[in-house]
Amino acid sequence: MFGEQLLKNPLIEFCDSVCRGCGQVMFQNNTVTGLLFFAGIFYNSTTLGVCAVLGTAASTLTAQLLGVDKPLVRAGLFGFNGTLAGIALPFFFNYEPAMLGYVALNGAFTTIIMASLLNFLGKWGVPALTAPFVLATWLLMFGVYKLSLFHPGALIAPALPSVAGLADMGTVTGRTFMEGLFKGVGEVMFQDNIVTGVIFVVAILVNSRISALFAVIGSLVGLCTALIMHSPETPVRLGLYGFNSVLCGIAMGGIFFYLNIRTFLYALGCMVLGAIATGAFSVLLSPIGMPALTWPFIVVTWLFLFAGSMFRNIAQVPTEKAGTPEDNLRSLAIGSR
């Protein structure tokens, strides 16, 4: 009773929406999950933590001010792209206090793009995923090169693809798997920290055991796919081939498809392709100094979702009804009675 009254307070309601927005980065509509995600980011970097909160708050507030349907805002669906957009700027550019205004601007811009994509993709029942974050961030990053707003970091220096870097393959050890597994989860939000990765897995576990399992499976599949395809050890250990597969795994592992053996194998294929696409888009974009971000996850997941409507042997969850994998299975069981 007290909790319900507390949530009616506009400030508390807004903070709850912000936390849920952060949780939705990995499809978790849960306040505690979002708080733990924020905690994991702050554990790794105070600067990235502040920008994550600011970006999420900016995108959520913009949605409220523009009159987006309240249930969508309260579920955090207009917050998660702001989270990623907020973190990306200080991650790829040398941080300075003036950047905070652009963090808020980037977060707010994701709301405009999100609304546009929902109107466009909603006709086919396909979610926008993290496309608003990628499009908004790419636009601002390209602008930085022309307008010299900030100083780009070493991570986005233009470079032609070369096989010379493949000469030093490194040695795969147990450390490669341990670090790569959890850093793959952490890198979903640009966190190169094994403890943060563990916190993220626990945060997902709070809301869904199945999603937590698929996050770990996705990271492992991305890691193994990269090693099988003879990737150098360092990017694998850093989780750089895991994070897109993590998102593919969670999305396909019971969120947008009812989970069974067929959809598990379908999700597995999506995870493998997510890792391959990570390498492909990284090569494609490196000459212009742009990071692939979560674009590999977006493209591969969209392909699998659009294709899913053609396959009679896998049952797709209507986008507007998608919940946790456990909730989706319960709904399916009730509907079949």
Curated annotation (Swiss-Prot):
Transmembrane segments: 47-66, 71-93, 99-121, 126-146, 210-229, 238-258, 264-285, 288-308
Subunit structure: Homotrimer; each subunit contains a pore through which urea permeates.
The protein's name: Urea transporter DVU1160
Signal peptide feature range: none
GO biological process terms on file: protein homotrimerization; urea transmembrane transport
GO molecular function: identical protein binding; urea binding; urea channel activity
Site (Important for channel permeability): T294
Domain of life: Bacteria
Membrane topology: Multi-pass membrane protein
GO CC field: plasma membrane
Predominant subcellular localization, coarse grouping: membrane
Similarity remark: Belongs to the urea transporter family.
Cytoplasmic side: 1-10, 309-337
Pfam families noted in UniProt: UT
Keyword field: Cell membrane, Membrane, Transmembrane, Transmembrane helix, Transport
Cysteine pairings via disulfide bonds: none
Origin species: Nitratidesulfovibrio vulgaris (strain ATCC 29579 / DSM 644 / CCUG 34227 / NCIMB 8303 / VKM B-1760 / Hildenborough)
Function field: Urea channel that facilitates transmembrane urea transport down a concentration gradient.
Compartments, as annotated in UniProt: Cell membrane
